[in-house]
Amino acid sequence: MESDAKNYQIMDSWEEEPRDKSTNISSALNIIEFILSTDPQEDLSENDTINTRTQQLSATICQPEIKPTETSEKVSGSTDKNRQSGSSHECTTEAKDRNIDQETVQGGSGRRSSSDSRAETVVSGGISGSITDSKNGTQNTENIDLNEIRKMDKDSIERKMRQSADVPSEISGSDVIFTTEQSRNSDHGRSLEPISTPDTRSMSVVTAATPDDEEEILMKNSRMKKSSSTHQEDDKRIKKGGGGKGKDWFKKSRDTDNQTSTSDHKPTSKGQKKISKTTTTNTDTKGQTETQTESSETQSPSWNPIIDNNTDRTEQTSTTPPTTTPRSTRTKESIRTNSESKPKTQKTIGKERKDTEESNRFTERAITLLQNLGVIQSTSKLDLYQDKRVVCVANVLNNVDTASKIDFLAGLVIGVSMDNDTKLIQIQNEMLNLKADLKRMDESHRRLIENQREQLSLITSLISNLKIMTERGGKKDQNESNERVSMIKTKLKEEKIKKTRFDPLMEAQGIDKNIPDLYRHAGNTLENDVQVKSEILSSYNESNATRLIPRKVSSTMRSLVAVINNSNLPQSTKQSYINELKHCKSDEEVSELMDMFNEDVNNC
């Protein structure tokens, strides 16, 4: 704990001191002496904890596999060996005379959240500086993020002078050391520090970055942001159909971008290539020298300082070569305003990102729905159609902006509604035409029926005339009479003489015609017979059936059947009597049957 407190005091004193080259070197030497005075075992344990912490922090970020690196050992009197690493992760050096392993990790995976972050901080795309100790020949490397620098420096006047990753560092009395082609393909500052051979010409003299360098970096980022925003707005206007104005504005923006790009590519070859951040030479008592250079990538990503630390890796879509622009004279207050405006722009970018994701989901669902319904075969064939509705659908599916999608959808709905109205009018006109045709058909059918009736009547009249002509033909011998003769002669029915049969009512009426000889007693006459004058159903003795003895069955059959039918007996008994009457063969059987009939009538 005491060592940590001393370490914090030394670091705080080093940050609060005025920034000169001499003060930087002296304060750095003090820190190195303090670190070397501590126990190496504690440093190793601390390094282990730091390594474990960095692994925990970087667990969610997808990193390429770290290839095993080799360690170089240097013995006194041995020749210098040049080694350049082709991968993004480089090896560390190991001093044979001292059993102290110093591991410096650089990259996005090595983010430290411990209390020793003031002494050693490693951030991707940050500012790196090296501190050397000429006595013991050890070296500590410090990589600090720009965002953390702004948090630590509360006062702009007392801001810390650090070296920028995008500005070349010049070493007095020596040439600039450039990186190799392999280091250009590195993963943007997330690799381990490479090892290079000691350069006798390079000295441990480092030029610190000035506020102008920081302003220059901010200007570069803001300019890149503006150019990207202008391209996005231009795309939106073109998709919405802005017309000639959008095209003129797009040409102007392209001209301005070309001018800025030409001005950016003017610097010398020193600015075009990425130089090594720090080169230090250390000599120990035995005469062994060790140099450790931190080579950064040649292509720096067009990183946006507004993006958070969690999403900066996935959203770096374009890379631009590092360029050096003429130093501007912006004030430090403008830098503060830029830093204050970060959260607002960050929120707007987050909303735009959500809108784009939702629009992409919408387009995917719409495309799948249209393909399933069979409206379209593929999205590539939408551009081949010339129909207004299909063009609107293609604009909706291909456009990213939700506002323009809504506009095209509104146009599509209006076009569909107008088409439906026209189709409805056509259908109504067709229905009216069909009704008119039906009326015409009904009228023609009615006329046809009338004609058929007229023809039928004409045919019947012709047939009748033909019949008259045939009947009258061939009868020339007939004498003509003055009497009127009908044109149509009909066959007359012959009059048949009807034979009146005997009816018992004839006796009551006094009709003497057709009186049958059916008297029971031969001596009785009609005048003296009382039974004949009485009613038929008055009594048994007065019944006509009792005294009727038919001479012939056929002559009396109907009269007896009529008597039975006029009785009050039920129909079944009547029918049975009639059937029995037909089977009678003699007058005795008839008389017995009629006696039974009279008994039944009296009992009723």
UniProtKB/Swiss-Prot annotation:
Q: Which Pfam family would be a valid example here?
A: Paramyxo_P
Residue ranges, annotated region (Disordered): 1-22, 39-360
Residues covered by region (Multimerization):
400-470
**Which superkingdom, per the lineage?**
Viruses
Residue ranges for the region (L protein binding) are: 450-483
- Mark out the compositionally biased spans (Basic and acidic residues): 91-101, 147-163, 245-267, 330-360
Q: What segments bear the compositional bias annotation Polar residues?
A: 47-61, 74-90, 129-144, 197-207
Where is composition skewed (Low complexity) in this entry? Answer: 277-300, 317-328
Keywords from the named record: Coiled coil, Phosphoprotein, Viral RNA replication
| InterPro entries hit by this protein | Paramyxo_PProtein_C (IPR002693), RNA_pol_Pprot-P_XD_paramyxovir (IPR016075)
Which GO biological process categories is it annotated with?
DNA-templated transcription; viral genome replication
Coiled-coil annotation: which residues? 424-451
Task: For the region N0 binding, give the residue spans.
Answer: 22-42
Q: Where is this region: Interaction with the nucleocapsid (N-RNA)?
A: 585-604
Task: Relay the domain remarks.
Answer: The N-terminus consists of a long intrinsically disordered tail. The central part contains the coiled-coil multimerization domain (PMD). Forms a four-stranded coiled coil structure. The C-terminus constitutes the alpha-helical domain that binds to the nucleocapsid (N-RNA complex).
What is the protein's quaternary organization? Homotetramer. Interacts (via multimerization domain) with polymerase L; this interaction forms the polymerase L-P complex. Interacts (via N-terminus) with N0; this interaction allows P to chaperon N0 to avoid N polymerization before encapsidation. Interacts (via C-terminus) with N-RNA template; this interaction positions the polymerase on the template. Interacts with host PI4KB; this interaction allows P to recruit PI4KB to the viral factories to generate PI4P to facilitate viral replication.
As for what it does, the entry says: Essential cofactor of the RNA polymerase L that plays a central role in the transcription and replication by forming the polymerase complex with RNA polymerase L and recruiting L to the genomic N-RNA template for RNA synthesis. Also plays a central role in the encapsidation of nascent RNA chains by forming the encapsidation complex with the nucleocapsid protein N (N-P complex). Acts as a chaperone for newly synthesized free N protein, so-called N0, allowing encapsidation of nascent RNA chains during replication.
Family that this chain belongs to: Belongs to the respirovirus P protein family.
Q: What is this protein called?
A: Phosphoprotein
